[in-house]
């Protein structure tokens, strides 16, 4: 009786964790579509700040660099998620293999978040000082909307 209950609890916990990881990955893909290189933050920046040609050129280069970096990290995230799925398929309970695969997913997701923030601040540095306040407002507004 106790073993069966413990097993059900373990499986339920594992399924819940897997659903959480999958939801996080879906969120990453929805917010970082590879088909559209410009994020909504990028578009809002163009609407809020009158960029000159030099700023546009600088930001476009930074955007291209970030797109390549983001794709590399997203590839690692997909691979890590695949490892997690394989680990669970081999042994559908919390195990050292599932733990390690979960940590790989977490590392890749954290790397993506960090790279995105570095990119945001690199973009800001590419603006004229008089345009940075408007950029900051757009950034803060976007983050606030995302947290609601």
UniProtKB/Swiss-Prot annotation:
Has UniProt tagged this entry with the keyword Transferase? no
Give each disulfide bond as a residue pair: none
Q: Which GO biological process annotations does it have?
A: response to cadmium ion
Report if keyword Protein biosynthesis is assigned: no
**What UniProt keywords apply to this chain's record, in alphabetical order?**
Cadmium, Cadmium resistance, Cobalt, Nickel, Plasmid
Q: What InterPro entries would the database entry show?
A: Metal_resist
Function in brief: Component of the NCC cation-efflux system that confers resistance to nickel, cobalt and cadmium. May be involved in the regulation of NCC.
Query: What family does the entry list?
Result: To A.eutrophus CnrR.
Quote the protein name from its UniProt record. Answer: Nickel-cobalt-cadmium resistance protein NccX
Instruction: Give the species.
Output: Alcaligenes xylosoxydans xylosoxydans (Achromobacter xylosoxidans)
């Amino acid at each position: 009786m106790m073993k069966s209950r413990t097993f059900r609890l373990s499986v339920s916990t594992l399924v819940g964790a897997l659903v959480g990881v999958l939801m996080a990955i879906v969120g990453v893909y929805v917010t970082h579509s590879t088909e559209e290189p410009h994020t909504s933050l990028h578009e809002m920046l163009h609407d809020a700040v009158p960029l000159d040609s030099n700023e546009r050129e600088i930001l476009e280069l930074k955007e291209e660099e970030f797109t390549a970096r983001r794709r590399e990290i997203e590839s690692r995230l997909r691979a890590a998620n695949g490892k997690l799925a394989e680990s669970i398929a081999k042994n559908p309970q919390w195990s050292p293999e599932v733990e390690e695969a979960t940590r790989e997913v977490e590392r890749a997701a954290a790397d993506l978040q960090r790279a995105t923030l570095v990119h945001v601040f690199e973009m800001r540095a590419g603006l004229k000082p008089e345009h940075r306040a408007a950029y900051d407002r757009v950034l803060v507004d976007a983050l606030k909307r995302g947290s609601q």
